[in-house]
Regions:
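Thiotemplate assembly-line natural product biosynthesis machinery
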Residues: 2-50, 73-76, 116, 150
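Phosphopantetheinylated carrier protein domains
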Residues: 61-94
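AMP-binding/adenylate-forming catalytic domain of the ANL superfamily
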Residues: 86-100, 104, 383-406
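Conserved pre-ATP/AMP-binding loop-to-beta segment of ANL
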Residues: 105-119, 149-153, 245
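Conserved AMP-binding A3 loop
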Residues: 115-142
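Conserved AMP-binding/adenylation subdomain of ANL enzymes
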Residues: 139-153, 161-199
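Gly/Ser/Thr-rich phosphate-binding loop
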Residues: 213-267
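AMP-binding/adenylate-forming catalytic core of the ANL superfamily
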Residues: 298-387
Length: 409
């Protein structure tokens, strides 16, 4: 991308960058302080190309960061936006204000806008850096802008530092020149009630399920929605249609690959986005400007460009729109001194899917109820909400099938 394009790329204006930084910092702080309160930045809830950047935030006052926490968060910002390539990383440690951090990111992007990094949980549950050519992200952003050119406003119910939120909550509205309203603090049914003609609601299946289940009034005319991060169940599509949603776009993609396919109806298969080429054997996808993308799910092909998603290939399961890894949760459980062994499995289906755990106490005479009460807050300090087992069963041995293999319970 040329320097001229970079200088005028609307998504790199400070008001957009501040929103991304606020979400990124909040996530990093949740990782560093499991179970702690979420930080609050006094930023405008509505952002547009014309908006003023908004109130500044003193990171020391808002977050009370220790030196190691500050270093961790600053490193994440540097790696994501490429500040370290131009010696701008040191500025984050000296000037601990959100305004300065945003201006530093903008300066870095003016110097080098060749790629952008996002982080995926990957196959092991540990954050993994995924680098995307900026040209590929711009191409995808322009594709969605053409599909959604008549939208007047975005209601954003997802964080904008993840790739889905960046594409639809930052790049799309900045490209179209329309405002974005952050609606994450509002109950999902209220978001539907507040939607106006021409709005695009950017959410995920869990959000839309709650919104549709508790909504008590029809939607305004000409409201659209986009959903991603996991397949949206048919009943959610149906409920939203009954409420008067005019159209819904479902995007299938991953942090590693960005958008892969899309569909406009629950009964339809996904159609590959135009730039993807299927490799022989159909196990990998290719595009000219990036490495091959290996599917994280099992697909069945309808024809040369359309496919259906059957489920996860790796050990990850989708809980509330997030990838979680039962093996990692099990590792945390068995690190508790009162736990001799454990197994963790998903239960439920679709958007109601959660984790359950079976625990073998280190002390055979341990009181099961007391151990359960001890584990719940202990796990809350070490696991994200989506990772925490909703059921904890306790017994003398792990469940087995008659053949001696690990069993369900």
């Amino acid at each position: 991308m040329s320097l001229a394009t970079t200088l005028f790329a609307p998504w790199w204006r400070p008001q957009w960058v501040r929103q991304m930084l606020a979400d990124l910092i909040a996530e990093e702080l949740r990782r560093l302080r499991p179970g702690g309160p979420a930080p609050h930045f006094d930023l405008p809830s509505t952002v547009s190309n014309e908006a003023e950047p908004g109130a500044d935030a003193d990171l020391d006052v808002v977050l009370g960061l220790g030196s190691i926490e500050l270093l961790d968060i600053a490193t994440s910002v540097c790696v994501r936006f490429g500040l370290h390539r131009h010696g701008l990383d040191r500025r984050l440690l000296k000037e601990r204000r959100l305004r300065v951090w945003a201006e530093t990111v903008v300066e870095a992007r003016r110097l080098d806008d060749s790629d952008l990094s996002f982080f995926s949980s990957g196959a092991t549950g540990e954050p993994r850096r995924c680098v995307h050519p900026m040209s590929a992200l711009v191409r995808e952003g322009m594709h969605w802008a053409a599909q959604l050119a008549d939208r007047r406003r975005v209601l954003r119910a997802v964080p904008c530092h993840h790739i889905y939120g960046f594409l639809f909550g930052v790049m799309l509205p900045a490209r179209l020149g329309i405002p974005v309203l952050d609606v994450r603090a509002a109950p999902p049914p209220d978001v539907l009630a507040r939607a106006e003609p021409g709005d695009l609601i950017v959410g995920h299946p869990g959000f839309f399920s709650v919104a549709a289940a508790d909504a008590d009034a029809a939607l305004a005319d000409a409201v659209w929605a986009v959903t991603s991060t996991g397949q949206c169940p048919d009943f959610v599509w149906g409920a939203l249609t009954d409420l008067g949603l005019e159209r819904m776009l479902e995007v299938y993609g991953t942090t590693e690959c960005a958008g892969i396919g899309n569909r406009w109806a629950a009964a339809d298969p996904f159609t590959l986005l135009p730039w993807w080429v299927v490799e022989p054997g159909r196990e990998r996808l290719l595009r000219a400007d990036a490495d091959a993308c290996v599917a994280a799910d099992r697909w069945v092909w309808v024809d040369g460009r359309r496919f259906r998603v059957l489920g996860r290939l790796a050990g990850a399961v989708q809980v509330a729109g997030e990838n979680v890894f039962p093996g990692r949760v099990r590792d945390v459980l068995v690190s508790h001194p009162a736990v001799a062994d454990a197994t963790v499995r998903p239960y439920g289906t679709g958007i109601a899917l959660r984790l359950k755990a079976f625990v073998v106490p280190a002390d055979p005479d341990a009181d099961a109820a007391a151990l359960r009460l001890e584990l719940i807050p202990w796990l809350a300090e070490r696991l994200r909400p989506a990772e925490r087992p909703r059921r904890i069963d306790i017994g003398p041995a792990l469940p087995q099938t008659p053949a001696g293999k690990p069993g369900d319970w």
